[in-house]
Amino acid sequence: MLTGVIEGFYGRDWRRDERATVMDWIAAAGMNTYIYGPKDDVHVRARWRVPYDAAGLARLTELRDAAAARGMVFYVSLAPCLDVTYSDPQDRAALLARVDQLARAGLRNLVLLFDDIPSVLPEADRHRFDSFAEAQADLSNMVLRHLRGAGHVVFCPTEYCGRMAGGDPRGSAYLQRLGSTLDPAIDIFWTGPEIVSEEIVAAHLAAVGEVLRRRPVIWDNFHANDYDIRRVFAGPLGGRSRDILPLVAGWITNPNNEAEANFPAIHTTGAYLADPDYAPERAIAAAVAAWQPRFRLAFGDGAVPSDLVALLCDLFWQPFALGPETTRILSALRAALTVPRPDPSDPAWRAALEDLRDLKRRINKLFTLMTEIENRDLFHTFHNYLWEAQEEVGHLVAYCDWLDEAPPPGAVFPATDRIHNFYRRGFGVAVQDILQRDRQGRYHHGV
């Protein structure tokens, strides 16, 4: 079963040393696969017809050798999907020329990507193919035949999640056709019911396997953050029970853009795949213990304490939730603020305020220690996120301290002695102000 990481995000690709580090983490987590497919490499997607030069090809063979030295399989991605004419002899020859160049270099394990494009068969192909899926399958089958059994192919479909299949994978004409025409030796990626799936359950995967006529390989975007540059995810893999594993042919995580942020994602994914009793909270505790040595301070023998590394994970937990501690503190404060004016003598208010003040102190301590760590890539990975966390919690504490002073009716916060110029502004915020959303992110107009 394929298990590991795909470098498949939109954004700046990883450096050579970052890829080596990620490979170390994959191997330590007991997984076996590294897939090279950064959108930032123009030879993968934007200029898929153009072969690598000697230096580019050497970089890939070096990565293959690095993966092999760790007992891992290395895949290279090609994404002809942006502008290929599936029936055009020149395009088909160009794709095979790319495959030949890679194969001659010993790079015979390929991923063919047809994701994030319109689900429309090009006009020029309609004389030969009766469906988009048939055209993609024909091109992919051609690649597999060309490899003559010397390599493996994984296919990423255009409909790669339940939402894109109209919520009903079994009823998707695209998936039906793909399942019936794509060579059974080619594996197929699937992200779950959503692009970023909060949960993946057995009934869903059974339906997917039925329509694809094979078990899918999960492309897990749970820790991906390329769709929201304001967030990073350092919590454990969640929302996936172990009973789904017999229904898949592999599990590949597509994690954060920032390589240094991905130790928890990789460590807990490996734990999920290996541990029959996997529990996210226990997995993240083990990940924190194993990750802490990377937080060594630049001077002396110390490191950021494990409780503060755990706080880092808690602050930047998962795409659908804050960490348990942060959730508890903010939930208690939200409840205490439901009254127009909190009573400074109310025990619930006092407890919520003290917990918030303590959270602020610990975030400040974490922020300061992170500026002093030796690993500057790790520092810069989290610096902007921690800066925002420190500023926002500081502002919240200042407001609650002001309320705790029992200000007179009609008083406004912040007063002139309060700093308030970090209020978020800009184009994105202006758009969001127009589109008023509820707590689930849904829009309502005129209600």
From Swiss-Prot:
Q: What is this protein called?
A: Protein O-GlcNAcase
Q: Which family does it belong to?
A: Belongs to the glycosyl hydrolase 84 family.
Q: Which UniProt keywords apply?
A: Glycosidase, Hydrolase
Q: Which stretches make up the GH84 domain?
A: 1-277
Entry-linked Pfam families? NAGidase
Any GO BP annotation: carbohydrate metabolic process
Reported pH dependence = Optimum pH is 7.4-7.6.
Function, in words: Cleaves GlcNAc from O-glycosylated proteins. Can use p-nitrophenyl-beta-GlcNAc and 4-methylumbelliferone-GlcNAc as substrate (in vitro).
Give the matching InterPro entries. Answer: Glycoside_hydrolase_SF (IPR017853), Glycosyl_Hydrolase_84 (IPR051822), O-GlcNAcase_cat (IPR011496)
Indicate the residues that form the catalytic site.
116 (proton donor)
Q: What class of enzyme is it?
A: hydrolase
GO terms for molecular function, please?
Answer: [protein]-3-O-(N-acetyl-D-glucosaminyl)-L-serine/L-threonine O-N-acetyl-alpha-D-glucosaminase activity; beta-N-acetylglucosaminidase activity
Gene3D superfamilies per the UniProt record, alphabetical: Glycosidases, STAT, domain 1
User: Could you tell me the EC number(s) of this protein?
Assistant: 3.2.1.169
